[in-house]
């Protein structure tokens, strides 16, 4: 998809270098000569408008040869207005049409786009007028949001007109999965009606503008001109509708609505050491957050006695299963344990095919190892030939270890070991065997490096170390028995930062910085207005005001510039992107304080107050913006930072579907992703690949179809299907995550790590050998590579592609893994 005409260059002006944008050039107003007029949202003549659009699409499908033998409506309402079908009949017809067309999308990317447009027509048939939407009890908008929408209605309707003029037609043709995902996010209203896509963006922008207007520095950082509710609304509305940045799923579902939480991540460390207190903590803290649809990471390291941990795991497993029944946003729990926990071997065998017994099976709870460096140091001693290297497990008598990290941890561990306080000793090879076997068989445990997380934190944590991360392993926050970690997320759509400049596709850093600036203000605004389930979470949010700004479309952006992820130009660009993301986010946060807002609570005790920034903890970091960093460093010492944390690279599996770009910072999972679910087939073709293929065979449709057939036979592996075709040489860049050398992908994570002050949800993608086996050493070597690179997250999921077919085991229990040679 060509997005290059959406954003114009940004200019730099004002004391704080605000990136201004002339929004009158962002999207053109409605073209009166267009075949379909903009939505008349005042009187909602929906049926006739949709019938006309449906007629045009069916004509287009007929011309493409895709309607042969299929039922059509083909009603030209301009000639026969009395023949307009009912909205119910049109919706049913659209559903049948999409279901029949979906399989053919594998061969024609234009059809994939048209199917998306059909789904948007189905959405439009359920729209309601703006007043009806505002008063919906099922939507339950906050009073102050409703009040502002009414007060500034004339201004909002001008932005809505702009949306229907050019943004909406572009969104409607993004693709089928985008349309289906938007349909899922739009709020269900009374009488079978639904929030419209335009109302969806109005809700998000109005809610954020309402909160931003309560703290003037939020608004003034967006403009050097007049800063008020209207200009703030328009800024957010146009950026959101144009997908420059994308809010988190909880935000899209709940922002602006009463009694909801928009935070994505909650981190807990109850520090309970018996079953009774742990169950109390679950009841009082875990359950409310599950019901608020938040993802939870919880450390149970202190629950380290006899007959406790696995029974509590079973309780959590049942809670997750019950909480996710019939929910639009399923959630989950990840339990964090250190590898010296007395019950660690039982925990490693609680999921999937490795579950020792049904009574201890916990398929709805994830496990993460909060691993000390010492575990890997001992394994390296074994690899280097040392005999009888062991790993010792401890019970609660060694609880002091949870408070320590790095050298202090190692000294205390070895002291306890020498005094004979261990409850079991395991050969280090067997310990690693158990970890890798569980990962290869179930997708987890996730693996994070405790020492790296603590070393690079904003305060000195020695003596009270950080105990865990979140559900998806990208959030690193200090928690305790009285304070939960909380993080609100948004992702920058990097594909929207690629532009045609002098005939070449280039990355626009002004667009990137503008997107980060908007996302920083947006996330801070929604944090102000969001409810949190418990006082502990309220305390954590207020103490740190931690943000998690990530990315999506990383691979899509690089492909659109013709770059392989691992060539030198790509590696250089990778570092620059994340350096400027951190720079802009911290600049905005500092500006908040310069304009009168207080720094986060622990600022005076943080390294920031002494002028130390995150990348200062890394060796040999080369900065592109040395002068700007030096100035910002001085400003931070002088004024402070409003937020404690900024960049977190989360998975964007759901939100990247609305943008039709690659997930997070990972390579594309497949060039033709297909997954059968309980609601039907989820299909996502690589549109860039299919469009380029059409260009190559522009005058030879038979050859194009033959090439696609070859790709189908090769499970859409480019090298296998097209490696010998000289005309397809340019397509070899379309490698998938499984085609890349995983060590090189880890190197990309390492290159950007100095600028990621939280962490990265780094998944490993591994293919079995031809005989259907998987060597444990392959996984282990990658973990060692991540450890030596100094990463905080060593492995999120371990995804295994079967050698015999396209089946991929993703750790969700839907497919079984192949056998492993360990």
Swiss-Prot record:
The EC number(s) this enzyme carries: 1.17.4.1
Highest taxon in the source lineage: Viruses
GO biological process: deoxyribonucleotide biosynthetic process; DNA replication; viral process
PROSITE patterns registered for this protein in UniProt: RIBORED_LARGE
Residues marked Important for hydrogen atom transfer (site): 265, 487
Magnesium recorded as keyword: no
Disulfide bonds: 265-487
Site residues (Important for electron transfer), renumbered to this chain: 796-797
Residues that bind substrate: 249, 264-265, 295, 470-474, 651-655
A Gene Ontology molecular function term of the record: ATP binding
Record-linked InterPro entries: HSV_RIR1, NrdE_NrdA_C, RNR_lg_C, RNR_lsu_N, Rrm1
HAMAP family on file: HSV_RIR1
Name of the protein this chain belongs to: Ribonucleoside-diphosphate reductase large subunit
Organism: Gallid herpesvirus 2 (strain Chicken/Md5/ATCC VR-987)
């Amino acid at each position: 998809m060509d997005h290059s005409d959406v954003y114009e260059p940004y200019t730099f002006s004002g004391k704080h270098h605000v990136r201004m944008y002339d929004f009158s050039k962002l999207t053109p107003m409605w073209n009166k000569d267009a075949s379909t007029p903009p939505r008349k949202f005042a009187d909602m003549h929906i049926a006739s408008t949709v019938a006309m659009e449906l007629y045009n699409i069916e004509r287009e499908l007929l011309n493409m040869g895709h309607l042969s033998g299929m039922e059509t409506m083909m009603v030209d309402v301009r000639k026969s207005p009395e023949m307009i079908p009912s909205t119910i009949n049109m919706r049913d017809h659209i559903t049948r049409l999409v279901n029949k067309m979906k399989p053919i999308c594998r061969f024609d990317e234009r059809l994939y786009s048209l199917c998306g447009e059909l789904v948007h027509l189905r959405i439009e048939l359920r729209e309601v007028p703006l007043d009806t939407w505002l008063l919906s009890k099922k939507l339950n908008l906050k009073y102050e949001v409703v009040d502002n929408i009414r007060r500034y209605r004339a201004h909002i309707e001008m932005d809505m007109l702009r949306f229907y003029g050019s943004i909406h037609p572009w969104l409607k043709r993004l693709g089928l999965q985008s349309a289906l995902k938007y349909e899922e996010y739009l709020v269900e209203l009374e009488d079978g009606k639904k929030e419209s896509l335009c109302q969806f963006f109005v809700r998000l922008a109005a809610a954020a503008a309402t909160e931003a207007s309560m703290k003037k520095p939020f608004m003034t950082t967006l403009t050097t001109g007049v800063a008020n509710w209207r200009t703030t609304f328009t800024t957010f509305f146009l950026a959101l509708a144009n997908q420059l940045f994308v809010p988190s799923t909880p935000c899209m579902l709940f922002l602006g609505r009463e009694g909801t939480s928009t935070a994505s991540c909650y981190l807990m460390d109850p520090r309970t050491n018996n079953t009774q207190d742990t169950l109390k903590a679950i009841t009082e803290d875990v359950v409310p957050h599950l019901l608020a649809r938040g993802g939870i990471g919880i450390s149970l390291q202190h629950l380290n006695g006899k007959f406790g941990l696995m029974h509590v795991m079973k309780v959590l497993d049942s809670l997750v299963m019950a909480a996710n029944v019939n929910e639009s946003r399923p959630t989950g729990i990840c339990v964090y344990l250190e590898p010296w926990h007395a019950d660690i071997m039982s925990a490693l065998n609680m999921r999937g095919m490795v579950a020792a017994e049904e009574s201890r099976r916990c398929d709805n709870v994830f496990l993460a190892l909060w691993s000390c460096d010492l575990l890997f140091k001992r394994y390296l001693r074994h690899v280097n030939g040392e005999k009888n290297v062991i790993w010792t497990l401890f019970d609660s008598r060694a609880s002091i270890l949870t408070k320590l990290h790095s050298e202090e941890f190692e000294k205390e561990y070895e002291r306890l070991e020498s005094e004979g306080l261990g409850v079991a000793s395991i050969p280090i090879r067997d310990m690693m065997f158990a970890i890798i076997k569980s990962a290869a068989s179930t997708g987890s445990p996730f693996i994070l490096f405790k020492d790296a997380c603590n070393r690079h934190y904003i305060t000195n944590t020695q003596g009270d170390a950080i105990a865990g991360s979140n559900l998806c392993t990208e959030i690193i926050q200090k928690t305790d028995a009285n304070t939960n970690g909380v993080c609100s997320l948004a992702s920058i759509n990097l594909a929207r930062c690629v532009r045609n400049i002098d005939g070449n596709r280039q990355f626009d850093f002004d667009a990137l910085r503008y997107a980060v600036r908007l996302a920083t203000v947006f996330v801070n605004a929604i944090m102000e207005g969001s409810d949190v389930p418990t006082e502990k979470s309220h305390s954590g949010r207020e103490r740190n005001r931690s943000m998690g700004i990530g990315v999506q479309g990383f691979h899509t952006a690089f492909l659109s510039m013709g770059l392989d992820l691992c060539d030198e130009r790509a590696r250089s660009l990778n570092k620059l992107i994340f350096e400027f993301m951190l720079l802009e986010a911290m600049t905005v946060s500092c500006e908040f304080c310069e304009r009168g807002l207080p720094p986060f609570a622990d600022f005076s005790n943080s390294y920031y107050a002494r002028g130390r920034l995150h990348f200062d903890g890394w060796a040999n970091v080369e900065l592109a913006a040395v002068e700007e960093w030096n100035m910002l460093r001085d400003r931070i010492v002088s004024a402070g930072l409003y937020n404690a944390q900024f960049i977190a690279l989360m998975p964007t599996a759901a939100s990247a579907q609305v943008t039709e770009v690659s997930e997070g910072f990972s390579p594309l999972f497949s060039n033709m992703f297909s997954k059968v679910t309980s609601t039907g087939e989820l299909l996502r073709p690589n549109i860039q690949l299919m469009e380029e293929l059409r260009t190559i065979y522009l005058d030879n449709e038979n050859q194009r179809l033959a090439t696609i057939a070859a790709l189908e036979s090769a499970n859409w592996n480019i090298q296998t299907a097209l490696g010998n075709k000289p005309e397809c040489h340019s397509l070899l860049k379309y490698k998938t995550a499984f085609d890349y050398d995983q060590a090189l992908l880890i190197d990309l994570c390492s290159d950007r790590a100095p600028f990621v002050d939280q962490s990265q949800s780094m998944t490993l993608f591994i293919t079995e050998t031809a005989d259907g086996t998987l060597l444990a050493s392959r996984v282990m070597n990658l973990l060692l590579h991540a450890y030596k690179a100094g990463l905080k997250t060593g492995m999120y999921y371990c995804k295994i592609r079967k050698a015999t077919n396209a089946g991929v085991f993703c750790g969700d229990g839907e497919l079984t893994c192949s056998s492993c040679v360990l």
